[in-house]
Amino acid sequence: MKGFIAYIPAGFPDLETTRKILIALNELGITGVEIGVPFSDPVADGPVIQLAHSVALRNGVTMKKILEMLGEISVDYDLYLMSYLNPIVNYPEGKEKLLDELKKLGVKGLIIPDLPLREVKNVNIAYPIVPFVAPNTKDEEIEFINSVQAPFVYYISRYGVTGEREDLPFADHIKRVKERIKLPLFVGFGISRHEQVEKVWEIADGAIVGSALVRIMEESPKDEIPKKVVEKVKELLGK
């Protein structure tokens, strides 16, 4: 099995359910989990994940509470924090305190959707930041990625916001990017079926799935959410 990263929105429908999901996913041998930090203006996310953000915010979920929850669990897969820039730079105890806490928790990297590739080195965040590549990313920017320290590169396989799609476009471009970068290449945005995961595995190092899992969470009774998420991930992995 190649790489697989699941996106789980923290605090949807509540942090206790998030904790149970993270523990339940530990049995599947996946590469990692992106922990989504709720934000009031999630511009890169589609309606499914936007709803999860709004529910979590109404429930009073904060960055600090997310870190406390992560401190209560131990998992074998890699943890990544997916957050818009604002909650990071405006952390109440200061950005450096946040980064120190993330390091103690073993978080492998930050995924910041509203941080342009060229700005990564200018925001003064001393932590591995996952760069994004899209079908319209210029060649010189792809070369720039090789100068960035990061756990992997996140390829956005569709223009626009997150959400489930039927096809996997830009396969040729994904292959070209894969040939030119030194870091592992993971493809996300729109993957919802095992067949799509397999197509990604053929041309990249791993797949990232978000909206398909969040939809399962939205459609399931709260006490069944961890089990239903595990079942969906197994389906995506072909297990």
Curated annotation (Swiss-Prot):
CDD domains (UniProt xref): Tryptophan_synthase_alpha
Pfam families in the record: Trp_syntA (PF00290)
First-tier enzyme category under EC: lyase
InterPro entries, sorted: Aldolase_TIM (IPR013785), RibuloseP-bd_barrel (IPR011060), Trp_synthase_alpha_AS (IPR018204), Trp_synthase_suA (IPR002028)
EC number, as in UniProt: 4.2.1.20
GO MF annotation terms: tryptophan synthase activity
Keyword annotations from UniProtKB, A to Z: Amino-acid biosynthesis, Aromatic amino acid biosynthesis, Lyase, Tryptophan biosynthesis
Catalysis: reaction(s): (1S,2R)-1-C-(indol-3-yl)glycerol 3-phosphate + L-serine = D-glyceraldehyde 3-phosphate + L-tryptophan + H2O
GO CC terms of this entry: cytosol
Domain of life: Bacteria
Pathway terms, separated by semicolons: Amino-acid biosynthesis; L-tryptophan biosynthesis; L-tryptophan from chorismate: step 5/5
Residues forming the catalytic site: E34 (proton acceptor), D45 (proton acceptor)
Subunit structure: Tetramer of two alpha and two beta chains.
Function recorded in the entry: The alpha subunit is responsible for the aldol cleavage of indoleglycerol phosphate to indole and glyceraldehyde 3-phosphate.
Record family assignment: Belongs to the TrpA family.
Protein name listed in UniProt: Tryptophan synthase alpha chain
Organism: Thermotoga petrophila (strain ATCC BAA-488 / DSM 13995 / JCM 10881 / RKU-1)
Gene: trpA
